[in-house]
């Protein structure tokens, strides 16, 4: 899950695209106790601090944003902390990644389960329901498909700890078990990487795929070889040449090739 979260962070730093002629609206609905406070629309900027582009009041569980957007990745920040009280970043302040486009968008969530700004293992976490943005729909679909790989890798990590690290610390010879689990883990990591590369190639015209490519070329993961990177670069050039995102991708591409 850390991988998914990281890729979400890098996406926020880097995405850009063209907008429609009309604007967007975000109609937010929160359920749960004390659903009153403030909401912010925040845009992350590459190598800079986040920028708050809009704010509004959350009243009786409802809030609204409207405007026009060119860069599609934003974050909805909901702050239900009362003035003067110690901020609670787990239960009263929430952060949701949103691929915003110029359309009518709805945001529905329960304050009891919205993902907090800071992760808390003891707290149930459930993403809000977001509708009306086709780009965000693609992002959600991708994460659902990735979940199979992530869950399997998490299980293998737990097995490695329980079946190898703990017994090994007790002086038991379990090296064969450890090697078997490690090989299985590498196999699933390769499967996950292949899925993500296939996704990038299939959706090269989408900001979601552009963000995934930037994530890997930023050094958090490593693509297989220079040929694979060059093929990916050619696909993006058709749709992104001349944009700020393309320029950043070029720089990351050059740096990554030097590392190989």
Name the predicted role of every residue range.
Residues 185-193, 223-230:
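Helix-turn-helix repeat elements of alpha-solenoid scaffolds
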Residues 17-183:
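A non-transmembrane, solvent-exposed segment enriched in polar/low-complexity residues
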Residues 4-13:
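Sec-dependent N-terminal signal peptides
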Residues 175, 205-219:
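Amphipathic alpha-helical repeat scaffolds of TPR domains
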Residues 199, 216, 236-240:
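Alpha-helical solenoid scaffolds that mediate protein-protein interactions
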Residues 228-260:
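N-proximal helix/coil linker or "cap" segments that precede and/or mark the start of modular domains
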